[in-house]
Amino acid sequence: MISVRNGNSMKRAKSSWASRMVMLLIVVLILMAGGYGYSTMIEPGLLDITRPVIVVKQLPESLDGLRIVQFSDTHIGEGYSLQQLDELIEKINEGRPDLVVFTGDLIDKFRLFTEGRERLPQSLAKIEARLGKFAVYGNHDRGGGASTYYRSCMEEAGFKLLVNESYPIEMPGERRLVISGLDDYLLGQPEEEAVWSSLEEKDYNVVLVHEPDAAAQWKTIHPLDLILAGHSHGGQVQLPFIGPLIVPPLAEKYVEGHYELESASRSRHLYVNRGIGTTRKKVRLGSKPELTVLTLRRTPA
């Protein structure tokens, strides 16, 4: 009798263990399905409006409080529509920017994006900025006819497309605000010396570039004050305690957010925007799309 009872107990224990394992498997599958649904259908549409304040002691008084709105990597196409862009533009204008900058990758797959080409510059033209709108090439803006279209689109929309050149903005006082832009480092022809030779020590110099890791080579270059970049998408997928799973070339050192860089002469700041759209796969997890409203200050608020 004792052996029979023990046998029945073991059977019940095995049955209970099997039931728990089945339930655990069901829970895991539900969580996986939920995570997939969230990362493909929800988070890609959860815009994060970040508001970094960069304090620069030597900032000209005329630039104290300057508001720069940066957006990047819209990748318009299957994963991001013109209607979504129009909604984004409303939020850009709500930020009442002094400057608006776009740091590349406007359309995801240019050859497939045919119906919206005429409308796109009309949408971008609605963006308002007191001191101007500026853009640089990204790798998706180059090749296959994209380069020519991107230039005409941005210029028709009122953006100044900067390709290895600088654009000075006269401000009250002796120091100017100078916006410079470099060509794409992956598919373009960046000419750094053409930009560096145009910069003056007395000015406040902002540099736009698509790939952020280019800035790692500029430690001895001066005078650079603020570098704005995109390209990384923040990895698109980030996991707790691990970080981004995959980042593109030239976005491995600087992935997202604000970095204070080493400089020989003055404080230098880099901000990497996570981008708006997605590429390859419409998925974001732990890396929400970002609209940056950046403010320059002489002293902390």
Residue locations for each model-derived region?
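N-terminal membrane-anchoring alpha-helices
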Residues: M1-S62
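Short, Asp-centered acidic motifs that coordinate Mg2+ and/or phosphate
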Residues: D98-L99, F134, F159-K160, L177, ...
